[in-house]
A protein has these predicted regions:
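Helix-loop element at the rim of GNAT/NAT acetyltransferase active sites that forms part
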Residues: 31, 35-45
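A short beta-loop-alpha structural element at the N-terminal edge
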Residues: 21-33
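A conserved beta-strand-loop-helix scaffold within acyl/acetyltransferase catalytic domains
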Residues: 48-91
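Conserved active-site alpha-helix within GNAT-family acetyltransferase domains
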Residues: 101, 124-141
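A conserved short alpha-helix in the GNAT/GCN5 acetyltransferase fold that borders
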Residues: 95, 104-112, 134
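Conserved glycine-rich acetyl-CoA-binding loop
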Residues: 87, 91-102, 125-127
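Conserved GNAT acetyl-CoA-binding A-motif
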Residues: 111-123
Length: 142
């Protein structure tokens, strides 16, 4: 399956008032990250893989709903100029509630606050994520 790569074109900022429900995970929070993976039906991540991700500059955030880690996204620092909003995932029973948008926006703001070019990608048949990407203000790179 082909992917579509998007680049962010700054068009202003949308303010949301829920920053306390989304936060970055520290390197010491692998257990919490693995809890989210299990809720998504994925295998837990080994400790050495988690630390390697952080060493390479990948940082995860989680969106909590009533204390449950229901959505995640990360920033992948591919270069000194461009960072990517990546690995956006929402627990199936919590989808279609705006959580993918909110967790992606959290990462996007971090990237822009650091003066980097923001990118994001998704599968060409993932129409739900394409709508999120469009709402965030990204345009496809053709």
């Amino acid at each position: 399956m082909a992917e579509i790569v998007y680049m962010y074109i700054f068009q202003g900022t949308e303010t949301i008032n829920d920053s306390t429900s989304v936060r970055w995970l520290s390197m010491k929070e692998l257990r919490l990250f693995n809890e989210h993976l299990l809720l998504c039906g994925q295998d837990p991540l080994p400790e050495e893989t988690w630390y390697k991700l952080y060493d390479e500059g990948t940082i995860y955030c989680v969106l909590f709903e009533n204390g449950i880690p229901v959505a995640r996204a990360c920033v992948e620092k591919y270069s000194n100029e461009a960072w990517e909003v990546a690995d956006v995932r929402v627990v199936k029973s919590y989808r279609n509630k705006g959580f993918a948008y909110r967790v992606s926006l959290f990462v996007l703001k971090y990237i822009l606050d650091n003066g980097k070019t923001a990118t994001i990608r998704t599968e060409e048949d993932n129409y739900s994520m394409q709508r999120v990407i469009s709402k965030l203000g990204f345009m496809p790179l053709l």
